[in-house]
Amino acid sequence: TGEKPFTCKECGKSFKTKQILCTHELSHTGEKPYVCIECGKGFYQKGHLNVHSLVHSTKKPFICTECGKTFIVKQLLHEHFLIHTGEKPYACPECGKLFRLKQLLTSHLLTHTGLKPYTCPECGKRFAFRGNFYQHLHLHTGDKPFSCTECGNCFATKVQLQRHHLLHTGEKPFVCTECNLSFAGLANLRSHQHLHTGEKPYKCTECGKCFRFKGHLTSHMKIHSGIKAFICTECGKEFTHKYSLRKHQRIHTSEKPYVCTECGKSYKQRRSLNDNLRIHTGEKPFACTECNKTFLSASCLQAHKQTHTGLKPFQCNECGQLFSRKGNSNVHLQSHTGEKPYTCAECGKSFTTKVTLNHHRYTHTGKKPYPCTECGKCFRQKYELRCHQYSHTGENPFECTECGKSFPSRARFNRHRNIH
C-alpha cells in the first residue's frame, strides 16, 4: 500500500515497519550493536556487518569489463559501472536533477526540505547528513583517525585519505570527454568541465559575483560578513577560512606535503604541485579566447586576459595604486607594512615573497638554472633569461607612451620613464 505509519521522533522520517524504525533510531543514538570480530568496527544493521566482513576477505570476484577494477559484491560493481556509462537513473521530483545512486538522491532531497536532524553538541551547528556531522565533530576533537601508509599523514575522513593517496599512486581515473585531461577526483573533473561550458550557476546576492560551485559561493560570502574566526597561534594573523589558516601555518612550519614524483620538488599547496607537473609534461590546458595563447594554470590565464582588457581591479588601500593581480597587490602591500616573512637560512636576510627568497638563495649556491638555448649563457632568474633572449631576437617589448622609445627590459624602461 506504500503506507508508512511508524515515524521517527528525532527527524520525522517514516517507515513501513516498527523494526525498520528501531534500526533507524540507532543512527540518532549512535548505538552500533553489530561488531566486526576482525577489526572491531560497529554497525547499525546486521546486513551492513555482513557486507563489511567481505572487506577482510581478499576475494573480489566481480570485475569491471571496462577498467578491470574488482569488487567484493555485485552491487558495488553495478554502482561503479554507471561511471563508465554516464547513466543517472534516479531523478529528483523537485528539480529534475539526476543521480547515479539512490542514496545520493536521498541526500539531495534534504536540500529541498531544509531538514537538518544532526546537531553538534559543541557549537550547535546543524547538518542534513550524518557523514557531514561526524566530519564536523573532528574540528572540535582534532581527531584524524585515517593515516596514510606511504607518508604517515593523517586525515579526519576516509575520503580525504583516499584523495591524498592518489598523490602517491599518480592515478587519475576521471577523464574529460572534451579535451582528454585526466583528474584524480570527480569533483576536480566537474570543476574543470565548467571551463568548457562557462557555467557559473551560484550567484552572490551581495555583489553579484558568480561561482561554479555552491561551496565556493558559501566560502565567498564570508568575505562580506567580515568574520575571521581562524587565528594563527604563531603570529596572531586572522583568516576567514580554515584552509587559508592551514596554508598560512606552513610558512611557520615549513611543511611541504605535496611532492613531485618527477623532480622531487615539494610544495605547500596542491595547486603549486599541479602547476609544476605541467612544466614536466609541457601541458598548457588553459587557452586565451582572444589570442589563443596557452598557459600552465588558470591563474596565469586570468592574469594574461587583463592584458587585453587593461583591467586592474585590485587597489592598494594605502596609496591607491592599482594592480591586475591580487598576488601583486599583496606583495606591494608589504612595502607599506614592512612585513618580510621569508628568511634566508644562510645569511638571515628577509624577503617579502618566497620567489624573491628563492632567487636570493642562488647567490649562495651559485646556481644558474636558466640557460639560453641560443648561446648557452645561464641566468639565476627566468626573467633575466627572457630579457637576454631579446638581444638575440631584437625585440623591445616595453614601449614608452611619451616618446615611443622601446626597451628589452622593464627595469630599463622604468629608468627611462623617470626622465619624463
Curated annotation (Swiss-Prot):
It comes from the Eukaryota. One of its GO terms (cellular component) is nucleoplasm. The keyword Transmembrane does not apply. GO terms for molecular function: DNA-binding transcription factor activity; DNA-binding transcription repressor activity, RNA polymerase II-specific; RNA polymerase II cis-regulatory region sequence-specific DNA binding; zinc ion binding. Signal peptide: none annotated. It is found in: Nucleus. Belongs to the krueppel C2H2-type zinc-finger protein family. This is Gastrula zinc finger protein XlCGF58.1. It comes from Xenopus laevis.
